[in-house]
From Swiss-Prot:
Family, per entry: Belongs to the class-I aminoacyl-tRNA synthetase family.
Origin superkingdom: Bacteria
UniProt protein name: Leucine--tRNA ligase
Lineage: Bacteria, Bacillati, Bacillota, Bacilli, Bacillales
Keywords of this entry: Aminoacyl-tRNA synthetase, ATP-binding, Cytoplasm, Ligase, Nucleotide-binding, Protein biosynthesis
Length: 804
């Protein structure tokens, strides 16, 4: 008889909810485990089969740790602000609040139907004023610490979306969402000073149990490099151009300077003859994304300004060009171009027929730039020195002339924090008519997002909030001074920077979270989510955490101790699942046809957790067959427990059971769920072969299955006569001594030919081995009537009988 998944799964989900089975205790004396999922954005499409892969993994570990006696914090919530809900509201005329609320209900239903053991009393929602009150509070702390400031920056302006986008939201010159054209334009923006934490963000990666590849992505994003800052005087102007270079030793080969089209000196130093060309070039550059501008394969373009700078060491005059491959947001927005030592400069020099001065021996300047080591030439006091010594000497010479200094540079930019949208947290700042700026008093938080039907972007660069007079205009009651509220909102990243902290104390109205509770639960022990968040979310969350650590709010330097990226589930043809391809699989359909336990089991059995693997209907069916097999082994047609399950200890399954406990325990600890399931299958095969199954062994098996397939496990546990949920039952243990067989197989030979194989005790004496061999029926018939000359017994291996 196969089991009815619909009936059983509903029954146990109702039981868990009614009994609050997974409620996290506030017992701070118990050992803890904090298992965290990257909370989802509740889109209109609902869950797809990719979501449950990571969620199932954390759920297995959460259920496993509860059985090991841990107090487990395993929460879920919603990252619900952001562009998609607003875009939907614009397209349909619906309120993003309603849309978001409905989507959350769908997601929550789907998640509950998959049997995940979340403590729903700790649910958070980034759009709830009681939540974003504390997001705003953190912003105020950043502001007070000098880490939030207003700056005029060249931003990615998307007219179609009516907002500024971060660099990460722009791909190949168009918006990631919707594919609309994006242009560069200067605008006043809120910026967070993440660069102040660059060194700590880099150094503390070493202490984390994260995939090395992911740590490298963060290291590259931060991009620390050592070198020198060098000042070039601009000829005929009382101005200097500062450049950063990692190779100050090549300064004698600097045959021109290149400024970004947005550099502040461009308009000042451009000569009358070159003005039209320069302005036309600036306009074109404004239409390109940073990625397009810096692509290595693109044609080199640029324009001469007509101005010259003076090389501080050689005294040579060098022309000043502008080119879009230099970004105003990176370094100083100016580079010292050394065509003989940098391939991009080399190609630029070749394109515009600029001088190429060889300064390091070893290359062929007619073919390409030389980036290797070698003795310096044409380099004044640096001649004859190799790279390392030449770098030190060059810095010394520059410092002596007050023309440069040793410097560390970062690729990391400060975080552009404001968005010209409606659906986000209001930034709690007031701009007063006297030009001053204050934050909203903390006792007035949350600063509520006003409800309005008019959420279209203003198109001026201001957010839709600028259209709501009663929100914008304020008067200081004490002085009568008028002010305007900040109308930009925070990016979606804001709420997701700290949500893991709020789960720890979600109902606290007095503070972000109780310090004692934070001390107990932090850091997060296991964080599972997609690799697409490797840099941004994880870097931003680490930054905020470090600020909160400095403020004494959190007790740890880092938020997430162990991090794991689950792989992607692909469509059957190894293609990414997408609506346009029509290959998206809805978990609701699988839960209905095969059951939640089958889906959980299948997604963990597909392969290693971090691999990208194609969905297979056959694999899904196979997982269901395994659960049916377990059911049929233990439950008879009338629904009672099979009489194969016995209370007296037959030793037949000792080795198989203890091996299974050992293997599954090790595999759960290392997140190798696919091989754990294989071992559970081996044990069930052995149970089918056995005449009897010792009841404690089948109970231990059900405990091991429960983290993966909790519904069928609860049902079997209950039918075995237990009144309580399996959730908090102790995890099975294994005996090393029983991992090896009591019996071994030995070979019996007569005159060198194998005549029998027999099982004997592994501790059997030689004499007894010989006697058992001689008593064997096959051997007897072989030696009948013959004279036994010799019997040779090799312990644990064989008995050889020589008979004539």
């Amino acid at each position: 008889m196969n089991y009815s998944h619909n009936e059983i799964e509903k029954k146990w989900q109702d039981y868990w909810e009614a009994n609050k089975t997974f409620k996290t205790s506030d017992n701070l004396g118990q050992k803890k485990f904090y298992a965290l999922d990257m909370f989802p954005y509740p889109s209109g499409a609902g869950l797809h089969v990719g979501h449950p892969e990571g969620y199932t993994a954390t759920d297995i570990i959460s259920r496993y740790k509860r059985m090991l006696g841990y107090n487990v914090l395993h929460p879920m919530g919603w990252d619900a602000f952001g562009l998609p809900a607003e875009q939907y509201a614009l397209d349909t005329g619906n309120d993003p609040r309603e849309f978001t609320k409905e989507n959350i209900q769908t997601f929550k239903r789907q998640i509950k139907e998959l049997g995940f053991s979340y403590d729903w009393d700790r649910e958070v929602n980034t759009t709830d004023p009681e939540y974003y009150k504390w997001t705003q509070w953190i912003f105020i702390q950043l502001y007070n610490k000098g880490l939030a400031y207003v700056d005029e920056v060249a931003v990615n302006w998307c007219p179609a979306l009516g907002t500024v986008l971060s660099n990460e939201e722009v791909i190949d010159g168009v918006s990631e969402r919707g594919g609309h054209p994006v242009y560069r334009r200067p605008m006043k923006q809120w910026v967070l000073k993440i660069t102040e934490y660059a060194d700590r963000l880099l150094e503390d990666l070493d202490e984390l149990d994260w995939p090395e590849s992911l740590k490298d992505m963060q290291r590259n994003w931060i991009g620390r490099s050592e070198g020198a800052s060098v000042a070039f005087d601009v000829k005929d102007y009382n101005e200097q151009i500062e450049v950063f270079t990692t190779r100050p030793d090549t300064i004698y080969g600097a045959s021109f300077l290149v400024l970004s089209p947005e550099h502040e000196l461009v308009d000042l130093i451009t000569t009358e003859d070159n003005k039209d060309d320069v302005e036309a070039y600036q306009k074109e550059a404004a239409k390109k994304s940073d990625l397009e501008r810096t692509g290595l394969s693109k044609e080199k373009s640029g324009v001469f300004t007509g101005a010259y700078a003076v090389n501080p060491l050689s005294g040579q005059q060098v022309p000043i060009w502008i080119a879009d491959y230099v970004l105003s947001t990176y370094g100083t927005g100016a580079v010292m171009a050394v065509p003989s030592g940098d391939q991009r400069d080399y190609e630029f020099a070749k394109t515009f027929d600029l001088p190429i001065i060889e300064v390091i021996e070893g290359g062929d300047m007619s073919k390409e730039a030389y980036t290797g080591d070698g003795p310096h030439i044409n380099s004044g006091e640096l001649n004859g020195l190799y790279n390392e010594a030449a770098i030190e000497k060059a810095i010394e010479l520059l410092e002596n002339k007050n023309a440069g200094t040793r410097k560390v540079n970062y690729k990391l930019r400060d975080w552009l924090f404001s968005r010209q949208r409606y659906w986000g947290e209001p930034i709690p700042v007031i701009h007063w008519e006297d030009g001053s700026m204050t934050t909203v008093p903390e006792d007035e938080l949350p600063l509520l997002l006003p409800e309005t039907d008019e959420i279209k972007p203003s198109g001026t660069g201001e957010s839709p909030l600028a259209n709501i007079d009663e929100f914008v205009n304020v008067v200081d009651e004490a002085t009568g001074m008028k002010g305007r509220r900040e109308t930009n909102t925070m990016p979606q990243w804001a709420g997701s920077c700290w949500y893991y902290l709020r789960y720890i104390d979600p109902d606290n109205e007095q503070m972000l979270a109780d310090p004692e509770k934070l001390k107990h639960w932090l850091p997060v022990d296991l964080y599972i989510g997609g690799v697409e968040h490797a840099v941004l979310h994880l870097l931003y969350a680490r930054f905020w955490h470090k600020v909160l650590f400095d403020l004494g709010v959190v007790p740890t330097k880092e938020p997430f101790q162990k991090l794991f990226n689950q792989g992607m589930i692909l469509g059957e043809g190894n293609e990414k699942m997408s609506k346009s391809k029509g290959n998206v699989i809805n978990p609701d359909d699988i839960v209905k046809s095969h059951g939640a336990d089958t889906l959980r089991l299948y997604e963990m059995f597909m392969g290693p957790l971090d691999a990208a693997i194609a969905w297979s209907e056959n694999g899904l069916d196979g997982s269901r067959r395994f659960l049916d097999r377990i059911w049929r082994l233990l439950i008879t047609e009338d629904g009672s427990i099979s009489n194969k399950v016995v209370n007296n200890h037959s030793k037949a399954l000792d080795k198989s059971y203890h091996q299974t406990v050992k293997k599954v325990t090790e595999d759960y600890n290392s997140l190798n769920f696919n091989t754990a399931i294989s071992q559970l299958m081996v044990f069930i095969n052995d149970c089918y072969k056995a005449e009897e199954i010792y009841k404690p062994y089948i109970e231990g098996f059900i405990k091991m299955l429960a983290p993966i397939a909790p519904h069928i496990s609860e049902e079997l546990w209950s039918r075995l006569g237990h009144d309580e949920t399996i959730t908090y039952q102790p995890w099975p243990s294994y005996d090393e001594a029983l991992l090896v067989d009591d019996e071994i197989e030995i070979v019996v030979q007569v005159n060198g030919k194998v005549r029998a194989k027999i099982n004997v005790s592994k501790d059997i004496a030689k004499e007894e081995m010989e006697q058992i061999a001689l008593d064997n029926e096959h051997v007897k018939s072989e030696i009948e009537g013959k004279d036994i000359k010799k019997v040779i017994a090799v312990p644990k291996k064989l008995v050889n009988i020589v008979a004539k």
